[in-house]
């Protein structure tokens, strides 16, 4: 049985209030279906105008895998921060670990990447998430990421 949805749609304005990241390093456009079990889906619309495509690779642009991992971490950060109850919301998320990372297929301009993230552990301010990056339902990357939520 699926956990109930707590936040159905987190738009870019709310993400900007939640994360400290800004252009060119804010790598998610929205977060969908944040559930009570600390899972959710980050969405990134990959366009040819991404700064990374100037050098990766001009003749055959491929969205860098490390930016997908950062997109996973940013999605996890939004889920973690919005899952904290009460008025003392954390103001920063520090990316701590990457484990079991695999890149399976290239992501190109025009693709919509969905970062399917779910919490796999939590201890005090430390959170761990498993993530699958998907394009049209196909896994293009996966990783476990750890982060610390702090003031």
Swiss-Prot record:
Leader sequence segment: none
GO CC annotation terms, alphabetical: cytoplasm; membrane
Reactions catalysed: a (3R)-hydroxyacyl-[ACP] = a (2E)-enoyl-[ACP] + H2O
GO biological process, one term: lipid A biosynthetic process
EC number: 4.2.1.59
Active site (record annotation): 56
Compartments (UniProt record): Cytoplasm
Entry-linked Gene3D superfamilies: Hotdog Thioesterase
Assigned keywords, A-Z: Cytoplasm, Lipid A biosynthesis, Lipid biosynthesis, Lipid metabolism, Lyase
Top EC class of this enzyme: lyase
Any Pfam family hit: FabA
Role summary: Involved in unsaturated fatty acids biosynthesis. Catalyzes the dehydration of short chain beta-hydroxyacyl-ACPs and long chain saturated and unsaturated beta-hydroxyacyl-ACPs.
Entry similarity comment: Belongs to the thioester dehydratase family. FabZ subfamily.
Protein name listed in UniProt: 3-hydroxyacyl-[acyl-carrier-protein] dehydratase FabZ
Protein species of origin: Nitrobacter winogradskyi (strain ATCC 25391 / DSM 10237 / CIP 104748 / NCIMB 11846 / Nb-255)
């Amino acid at each position: 049985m699926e956990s109930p949805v707590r936040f159905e749609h987190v738009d870019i304005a709310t993400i900007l209030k939640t994360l400290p990241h800004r252009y060119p390093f804010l790598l998610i456009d929205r977060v969908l279906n944040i559930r009570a079990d600390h899972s959710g889906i980050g969405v990134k619309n990959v366009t040819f105008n991404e700064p990374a495509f100037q050098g990766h690779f001009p003749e055959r642009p491929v969205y860098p895998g490390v930016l997908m991992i950062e997109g996973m971490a940013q999605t996890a950060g939004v889920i973690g921060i919005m899952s904290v109850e009460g008025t003392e919301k954390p103001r920063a998320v520090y990316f701590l670990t990457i484990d079991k990372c695999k890149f399976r297929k290239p992501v190109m301009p025009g693709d919509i990447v969905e970062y399917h993230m779910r919490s796999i552990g939590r201890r005090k301010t430390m959170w761990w998430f498993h993530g699958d990056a998907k394009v049209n339902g196909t896994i293009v990357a996966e990783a476990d990421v750890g982060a610390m939520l702090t003031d």
